[in-house]
Amino acid sequence: MRTSPRRPLILKRRRLPLPIQNAPSETSEEEAKRSPGQQEPTQAQASQDVAESSSCKFPAGIKIINHPTVPNTQVVAIPNNADIQSIITALTAKGKESGSSGPNKFILISSGGASSHPPDPQSQAQTSTDSKRTELITETLGPKPGAKGVPVPKPPGALPRQRQESCGGEAAGCTLDNSLTNIQWLGKMSSDGLGRCSIKQELEEKENCHLEQNRVKVEAPSRASVSWQDSVSERPPYSYMAMIQFAINSTERKRMTLKDIYTWIEDHFPYFKHIAKPGWKNSIRHNLSLHDMFVRETSANGKVSFWTIHPSANRYLTLDQVFKPLEPGSPQSPEHLESQQKRPNPELRRNVTIKTELPLGARRKMKPLLPRVSSYLVPIQFPVNQSLVLQPSVKVPLPLAASLMSSELARHSKRVRIAPKVLLSNEGIAPLPATEPMKEEKPLLGEGLLPLLPIQSIKEEVIQPGEDIPHLERPIKVESPPLEEWPSPCASVKEELSNSWEDSSCSPTPKPKKSYCGLKSPTRCVSEMLVTKRREKREVSRSRRKQHLQPPCLDEPELFFSEDSSTFRPAMEILAESSEPAPQLSCPQEEGGPFKTPIKETLPVSSTPSKSVLSRDPESWRLTPPAKVGGLDFSPVRTPQGAFGPLPDSLGLMELNTTPLKSVPLFDSPRELLNSEAFDLASDPFSSSPPPHLEAKPGSPELQVPSLSANRSLTEGLVLDTMNDSLSKILLDISFPGLEEDPLGPDNINWSQFIPELR
């Protein structure tokens, strides 16, 4: 990058004034400053000066012009063939004659063509000028001690280069004139015509001459001296490792001792010899030891150690290689590019161009010493989890099947789009309890009927939707084989559901099936509660939005149902996706019990996986504690304690002193209950075994509540509403066929204990 040939004038003014220490050099500098204005005089001044020159005994062809800006100063144009010594003598005499009023300073410029004057007359003229300078100062410059009229000879040069040559030619002869402050004409100077003097080169650099002109005019001796001075003041733009390579590769055998490396660097980079601190040698030794490319070899006698470059790492970098000229289009050296980036000083850059004498684009570009790898982005594809596919015919244990189903449901739930949260009543969806006896209540409440309908209506409502829901169908099929292994006295509703789903998948119109409505086995209920708890924990941890769910009420849990009977199809979908059917309790909000007009549900629907209502046992309600522990005499129906033994209370509802809870009736009518009980008496395989739920895990939270003794019967669910007008009718319709025990008669029932409101 070339330096701009012109700088702001303020910088030039600050830079040029120098202290009066070396009179000859300073005078030459000052006269160099004055010289450029010699091309700006008017024709009138030129003719006037010519007349003066003719009158002052000057040889023919000499032109004397007043300086445009400097007072009492004249510019003398000397032809190539003129005698410089005689002209200097005439100018000295003229200065003495004029005294303080006339011009006492003369600037000599050559007015001929190419410079052909030998250097010897120039040196003689300069010496004569120096000898006469004191005379001029003492004799002719009495009133002006600061002004010195010193004519300085110049080698003849081309006429268009008069200003440039004058700035160099007067370098040897004059002292500084403090009164000369206007140097605006310096910006118009150029350095085309230059002499062979090193001082001229210094002046050119200080006056911001073009780099190409420097390369053309500067010769080897001055170039060496100037580059030495510039490099001393500026640190070389090479690393220690690069300079070590330059030194080692400069030898024929490509090896060098440590002392020779020091010497080579000092010779080629005087900065380290004159300016740098001695610690740079430590850096050289450090780099020799640090980089593996430098290998230390010992001579045969073991006294001398040489440093070489490993052949595999040696790129044979030399200092000459950096500046070696090549054909156009060849790459440039990285060292030179690095030097251009690192050094802001234009003088050092000028030094490089002086040494090369070639344009910047003709230098070699080499591979970087330390190649770098450009960074880039690597695209990464995240795998998508595929849903687990289960064969419906595979029989797996219940916990494993439940875990597989819960993981699959969790994955399916993540793919479902999140819908806005709305009330269930708006969409006609009702959360269904998972207890089989409770499912009987769906058509009753939805249609506003008394609990006197057969259970077949439930099956038709559940099966009739007939819609294929693939991810819901699989979990039901997986669960169905373990259900068939239970020797239950009557077919459970869950088995019925699974069979109906399989039938609906085969035929477009599902067949409603009739079956006895009975409770599942206690062990089955316990395992389902464990599975439900495990599934809830997993889905809560996998949900994208952690929601703080309101904990279910511990005293009187409430479940609400919609009046619309068309809500059972979506409700089944929610039930199958949220949890496995488990015994739950439905507690109406009012004291009226389940036989009153149903209340519209107000539970919000959340698209995120949420906890379902925890499982409850059908005998979670409370009566006044009985006085004895034996079998209940006040129960209208005697039930076998093995099949319908006590079940665990998952929510602590069995504790004493709790408010009596109103529950959904377990059966459509006492007659149907008694029929199922009679069937159970004949075919119950668990009648002689202890309650199987006691064998469940003791650490599960569902089993921490102490189990009830045998003083609770499932028929405690027949808590009737005393405010209902149909109470007497329902009680009168109760008959007990097939049971001949006396305590089962309605006359022996203690209704004050059975219904607390009668007290």
Curated annotation (Swiss-Prot):
Q: Which UniProt keywords apply?
A: Activator, Cell cycle, DNA damage, DNA repair, DNA-binding, Isopeptide bond, Nucleus, Phosphoprotein, Transcription, Transcription regulation, Ubl conjugation
- GO: which molecular function terms? DNA binding; DNA-binding transcription factor activity; protein kinase binding; RNA polymerase II transcription regulatory region sequence-specific DNA binding; sequence-specific DNA binding; transcription cis-regulatory region binding
Q: What induces it?
A: Activated in S phase.
Q: What is this protein called?
A: Forkhead box protein M1
Q: Which SUPFAM superfamilies match?
A: Winged helix' DNA-binding domain
Q: Which domain of life is it from?
A: Eukaryota
Matching entries from PROSITE patterns are given as:
FORK_HEAD_1, FORK_HEAD_2, FORK_HEAD_3
Q: Where in the cell is it found?
A: Nucleus
Q: What does this protein do?
A: Transcription factor regulating the expression of cell cycle genes essential for DNA replication and mitosis. Plays a role in the control of cell proliferation. Also plays a role in DNA break repair, participating in the DNA damage checkpoint response. Promotes transcription of PHB2.
Q: What is a biological process (GO) this protein takes part in?
A: positive regulation of stem cell proliferation
Comp. bias regions, Polar residues = 36-54, 604-613
Q: What is the lineage of its organism?
A: Eukaryota, Metazoa, Chordata, Craniata, Vertebrata
